[in-house]
Amino acid sequence: MALERTFSIVKPDAVKRNLVGEIYHRIEKAGLQIIAAKMVSLTEAQASGFYAEHEGKEFFGPLKEFMTSGPIMVQVLEGENAIARYRELMGKTNPEEAACGTIRADYAISMRYNSVHGSDSPESAAREIEFFFPESEICPRPAE
């Protein structure tokens, strides 16, 4: 199977609680490589652009407010079937429905403060990666 890339965010609630290292450990333990990463503080304009597909929905304002409330970690993950593997590792959006041992089951506070984001398709992964990372900042690692 070919390598695939996905996009991941460690959200403000998890960064504030110093969970970045724990989440990165789980990502790598799951066989995914972090090939780009940086800490950013989103502006309201950036949050609006990133979440443009949700504009007009009831949760759009609160989502922007949350995502601009503190720094986030954004990263590009690479591995076989990376999108599905990372989504399984994250668990369901609602932490009460997330399987035991998933990131959201273990660390999320609520549906809004659910610690992580991951792309849901190859198309969204490409768009989200491009939003934060020029190709020059992505550093694929050699196969072992």
UniProtKB/Swiss-Prot annotation:
PROSITE patterns: NDPK, NDPK_LIKE
EC numbers on record: 2.7.4.6
Binding site for ATP: K11, F59, R87, T93, R104, N114
Necessary cofactors: Mg(2+)
Gene Ontology biological process terms in this record: CTP biosynthetic process; GTP biosynthetic process; UTP biosynthetic process
Record flagged with keyword Lipid biosynthesis: no
Family (UniProt): Belongs to the NDK family.
HAMAP family from the UniProt entry: NDP_kinase
Protein name: Nucleoside diphosphate kinase
Gene source species: Vibrio atlanticus (strain LGP32) (Vibrio splendidus (strain Mel32))
Gene this chain is encoded by: ndk
